């Protein structure tokens, strides 16, 4: 693979071999992750380039979110950046005084711990118009940085680019090994001839505050992103928790499908547990008893 490497103010840019024309993409990672997963990250960069998406890799020993955002804005202005993926240990903005823009999360910020009552959000990085006032860095979890949404900031979200994170889970396995394995799978999948044309989306109890009005537009969003999925009947399937009293079997049967390309879950849960549904709606006491026995 041909690429060039440029070091600028401590950040190192691994430039794409493909010339940037209309758009580009960036992998933002930390120095340790890049050194441990260089082969896999460059393979990912190469496969995206072959598909027509010039991709930068930028790594550094990041000290604060502002440093990351400067790089993103620079690439956006100079190279028509359309999106980024944060890989490894990238600073996490913990936002306060912004709960009016969350879909459901509400917690008293005055009487609860900062860590619990703040919102970790990468809107700090991908919505360039939002403005923030820095408060402090967490003294225990050094990757957390607390900000207030500034009074003079826009009070609505309009992202300029898309963003995502690839972060290892704390399950006892070496973090870089997890990330390496993930990108090997990603590259292998990109090299197959299997088109992404079979998707399944499930919405659990409590998601979107159980609002049908909020849930319905998902089909339009996915149609915009993956129009080919809707060319034939049965390629896109959507299930809500209240389509049946006990949807667990329906969900499992969907996940067993050998032709399934993508599953999307909107649920509440814990790191090792997902809540598929709640108790079936009923006004009869014996139905409540039956539900308790079932669970």
Where are these predicted regions, by residue range?
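Bacterial Sec-dependent N-terminal signal peptides
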Residues: 1-12
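Cysteine-dependent hydrolase recognition
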Residues: 11-295
